[in-house]
Regions:
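His/Asp/Glu-rich metal/cofactor-coordinating catalytic motifs and the adjacent surface-exposed loops
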Residues: 1-90, 94, 106, 147, ...
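Long, hydrophobic/aromatic-enriched structural stretches that serve as scaffold segments
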Residues: 128-136
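Structured, charged N-terminal subsegments at the starts of enzyme catalytic cores
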Residues: 91-98, 102-123, 127
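Helix-boundary capping/turn motifs
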Residues: 99-103, 141-142, 316-317
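Short, flexible active-site-proximal loops enriched in glycine and acidic residues
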Residues: 121-125, 137-144, 176-179
Length: 375
């Protein structure tokens, strides 16, 4: 295997037949970090290479439109159960799913990106971070997972890890998947009012736990259950049900932006302490927390090791990990600098690298110029 293909197999998705091989593979690889990233694909299963085009804008709706589509879908499902307006017919059911659900469309767009994209290294880093910030394809979350990947992950690959951590944590997909949209502080107005009326309410620590355990410092930091609950209290009040009417969103949070919705009456009053860091009360507390975690020594060590194992070697050396850690610290978490360090160590290492089955499939399709995914 020549050097161009070795590097593309290790760090990218392999060269498509119409793509000329770069002479300077290292410069090419680093330049890929700032490549343009349109969602490329094909219209039909019979399409040729000349037919590769950007996905239509109507198939890449914004967050507000996705919430509207989900609300319509749920309303039609209610009519289906009640046998109203013909929604119980098989044709109506299929039409409702096709028109208003985004899960399958987003999945196909992701596959098309990987097969037809010209930014193969950037896509690999997008996939790495999308896996790191995994959310499940359940219930109303299916309409917003693709938006998280495109707008919280891909759109921030040239930013900082601090920015990506904040954007991923506060995204409706993450808040919905881990039930933070129902979490209220133990001493919040919402919790007291609901309990007075005999209803359940209170803190859900799912996201607070994952934020520490999986997304940032890892268990090596030896945080406590108190740290987890305090992180959850910082997150209390963030997010809302996608079906919530816009007038209610304005009333409870003075916004109709699902990605910036903070319900003050659900928030835990007072300052919080997470791993020794004092976090102020209010909406800005989440940014304080994610900024602190993004540059924590344990986060840097954990994620530098994870990046090295994914891209450099199945058993990365301490020098590989230290090289990435130093880039993280020197650039204050700048992802371009972190990813450049990963590329440099991956090229330097001659060890073969195990690939995810998904990555292997995309590489095989690109190399063979096969048409595997429908348009």
């Amino acid at each position: 295997m020549n050097e161009q293909f070795r590097v593309a197999q290790k760090l990218g998705l392999m060269f498509r037949p119409e793509t000329p091989l770069p002479e300077d593979i290292k410069s090419w690889a680093i330049s890929q970090l700032n490549a343009k990233s349109p969602a490329l694909g094909i219209k039909s299963f019979k399409s040729m290479n000349s037919d590769i085009k950007e996905w239509p804008r109507e198939l890449q709706p914004n967050l507000k439109k996705r919430a509207e589509m989900w609300t319509v879908y749920r309303a039609n499902r209610k009519k289906e159960r009640e046998k109203i307006d013909g929604q119980e017919t098989e044709a109506a059911k299929r039409a409702n799913e096709h028109k208003n659900l985004m899960g399958q469309k987003d999945s196909l767009k992701f596959s098309h990106r990987n097969v037809y994209g010209q930014d193969q290294l950037k896509i690999r880093f997008m996939s790495f971070w999308a896996n790191h910030f995994t959310t499940g394809n359940i219930h109303d979350n299916q309409n917003v997972i693709g938006h998280l990947i495109d707008e919280a992950i891909l759109a921030n690959l040239n930013s900082s890890f601090s920015e990506m951590l904040y954007k991923a944590t506060s995204h409706p997909s993450m808040l919905t998947y881990l039930d933070n949209i129902w979490s209220s502080g133990e001493d919040s107005v919402e919790t007291r009012e609901q309990r007075r009326n005999g209803r359940q309410a209170g803190l859900n620590d799912n996201l607070g736990r994952e934020l520490l355990e999986l997304h940032s410092v890892s268990p090596s930091a030896k945080y406590t259950e108190t740290d987890i609950r305090n992180a959850a209290n910082v997150l209390a009040g963030w997010g809302t049900d996608l079906e919530r009417p816009l007038n209610e969103m304005r009333e409870v949070a003075n916004t109709t932006d699902h990605w910036d919705l903070y319900k003050r009456t659900w928030a835990q009053p007072g300052v919080k302490r997470v791993m020794g860091k004092t976090i102020n009360q209010g909406k800005g507390g989440l940014r304080e927390l994610t900024d602190f975690l993004a540059m924590h020594e344990h986060t840097i060590s954990y994620l530098s090791s994870k990046l090295a194992q994914h891209f450099v070697s199945d058993n990365p050396s301490q020098s590989d990990i230290s090289y990435i850690k130093n880039a993280w610290k020197k650039g204050s978490g700048n992802l371009d600098q972190i990813h450049t360090a990963v590329i440099e160590r991956a090229i330097l290492s001659k060890e073969p690298k195990f690939q995810w089955p998904m990555t292997w499939l995309f590489q095989t399709i690109r190399l063979s110029n096969a048409t595997f995914y429908m348009g």
